[in-house]
A protein has these predicted regions:
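Ubiquitin-like/PB1-type beta-grasp interaction modules and other compact soluble beta-rich domains
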Residues: 1-66
């Protein structure tokens, strides 16, 4: 199925979770990362149980800290 992830169209297996998507993208779950699914925040504890669907839009946001 096709989804949008951080502005890129991707083909992922049906039934993929956010956790699986992050693995496909080579992303490591970190404290300074936020994942949105269709503009809704997904809590880190829900990555393994949140399933993406055809045409979903996922944004992976890395927070920047510093002064």
């Amino acid at each position: 199925m096709k989804i949008m992830a951080s502005g890129m169209e991707l083909e992922v297996p049906a039934g993929s979770s956010i956790e699986k998507l992050l693995d496909i993208l080579g992303e490591t779950v970190r404290q300074d990362m936020i994942v949105e699914l269709n503009r809704r925040f997904i809590h880190r504890r829900d990555y393994s149980t949140t399933i993406v669907n055809e045409s979903d839009i996922i944004e992976i946001i890395h927070l920047a800290f510093g002064g």
